[in-house]
A protein has these predicted regions:
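N-proximal low-complexity "stem/linker" segments adjacent to membrane-targeting elements
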Residues: 1-21
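Short, acidic, metal-binding catalytic loop of nucleotide-sugar glycosyltransferases
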Residues: 20-29
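Glycine-rich, basic loop-to-helix element that forms the pyrophosphate-binding segment
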Residues: 59-76
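A recurrent flexible, glycine/aromatic-enriched loop bordering the glycosyltransferase active site
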Residues: 66, 134-170, 279-280
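Short aromatic/hydrophobic "clamp" motif used to bind/position activated sugar donors
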Residues: 81
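Conserved donor NDP-sugar-binding/catalytic core segment of glycosyltransferases
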Residues: 95-137
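Catalytic beta-strand/loop signature of glycosyltransferases that borders the donor
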Residues: 113, 204-211
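Acidic donor-binding loop at a coil-to-helix junction in glycosyltransferase catalytic cores
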Residues: 187-193
Length: 415
């Protein structure tokens, strides 16, 4: 299998180090495809290697990195495309491990653990509070601290901070199936491509060892942090539920809609007192599913119809009980900060953003021992579902909670 390592560069300062890490590969059937977009010269030692192909292609000044990488990949001849930034390093067994893993698993996308290193030799070690695990790693006589990547589950795939990091490799078939890099993206292009790769049904495999060392520079992120945050939020908002639904399908987990007699989305089983897929009294008899057997519980315009106090606590405990580890509660409830919570005479419990603290924060839960559920608050926000709701000041609180049942979760865990 020919492996195409692709590298766009506007600054070849560290290319010699990159080249040395390629020369040291235990797997020898590779090509290095460099897309050169700078006046600075690439060292002759690199250009002189027959396995290196350099393309000097004028790129429009306003072209995004997505367009540049898509062009770079189009120039590759191999069956496996490996992303390699122009200032980073590969471990000697990187390409061999990728090829071996692809042949053994049939993966279309692979990623590994990684090291973030600085010029002074120190490492950027991510905070364990956000779910990160680290371990010691030695490379070329130097000691580093490696970061363990997260599994490809909805909690990690929906945030750039936890999504698959380097090394990242696509089979050419998987890359094309996903549509390649988005040419309109000037940043966050890799995250957006990873999400689309997953949604294309490509098999993901995490390789739990370090194959890549990422060089961090001063202000690597700080100058772009706001842009990154905003763009990743756009990607998340667009794809989050598609990712969750596909994860359920892959794991044969049903999706249920509580109080779903009306408005039940395709793919969900509705549960309600009557005229539903499952006719059942949820408040009286609980949720008619076994423990840890459900992928998503949808509760749109439902929680406010559960009596306050013990019944609401029991319902949240029930939702947690039936959710599989990593399963999602997707909820939408009229907020007390608008008129909707109180205007309907059938509403008998009242909710706002703070209400979900008791099910996702130890600080509040400790005062209500009857609450047994342990949720991670993935997203909680307030908005108007439609202009009509806005006109009539009917504000809703949305809460996406993830069932924490001992599995490794990305993001803060307060409970």
């Amino acid at each position: 299998m020919l492996v195409s390592v692709f590298t766009p560069t506007h600054n070849p300062e560290w290319l010699t180090e990159c080249f040395h890490s390629l020369q040291n590969q235990t797997y020898e059937n590779w090509e290095w495809v460099i897309l050169h977009n700078t006046d600075k010269k690439i060292p002759q030692a690199i250009i002189g290697d027959s396995r290196v192909r350099v393309f000097t292609v004028p790129v429009q000044p306003d072209a995004g990195i997505g367009a540049i990488k898509k062009l770079n990949c189009s120039l590759c001849k191999g069956d496996l495309l490996v992303e390699f930034d122009h200032d980073d390093l590969l471990t000697p067994d990187c390409l061999e491990t990728l090829v071996k893993t692809q042949k053994e698993t049939g993966a279309g996308f692979m990623y590994s653990d990684f090291v973030n290193f600085r010029a002074d030799g120190s490492c950027n070690v991510y905070n364990p509070y956000f779910g990160w695990h680290s371990y010691p790693f030695r490379h070329e006589g130097k000691n580093y601290t490696a970061m363990s990547s997260f599994a490809p589950t909805p909690d990690s795939l929906t945030e750039i901070y936890y999504a698959p990091n380097h090394v990242r490799a696509w089979t050419k078939q998987a890359y094309e199936k996903a549509g390649g890099h988005n040419e309109s993206f000037k940043i966050v292009d890799d995250f957006e491509l990873i999400v689309r790769t997953y949604l294309a049904g490509v098999k993901f495999v995490h390789i739990p060892k370090v194959l890549y060392l990422y060089r961090e520079h001063k202000n690597t992120y700080s100058e772009k942090l706001d842009v990154i945050r905003n763009l990743q939020q756009e990607v998340q908002n667009k794809y989050v539920y598609d990712i969750v639904h596909l994860w359920c399908k892959e794991n044969n987990l049903p999706m249920i809609d509580l109080g779903g007699r009306t408005g039940c989305p395709a793919g969900y089983k509705s549960i309600d007192l009557f005229e539903a897929d499952i006719c059942h009294d949820l408040v009286k008899d609980g949720i008619p599913f076994p423990d840890s057997s459900v992928g998503v519980v949808r509760a749109f315009d439902f929680l406010e119809h559960v009596p306050a106090g013990t019944p609401v606590i029991n319902m949240m405990n029930e939702i947690y009980r039936v959710l599989a580890p990593g399963g999602w509660l997707i909820s939408r409830t009229p907020s007390t900060e608008g008129r909707g919570a109180f205007q309907d005479p059938t509403h008998i419990s009242f909710w706002n953003s703070n209400s979900f603290w008791y099910f996702s924060r130890r600080e509040q839960q400790q005062y209500v021992p009857a609450i047994k559920c342990r949720f991670q608050a993935k997203r909680i926000w307030n908005t108007y579902p439609t202009d009509w709701h806005k006109e009539h000041q009917i504000l809703y609180v949305y809460a996406d909670l993830i069932a924490a049942k001992g599995q490794k979760l990305s993001g803060p865990m307060d409970i």
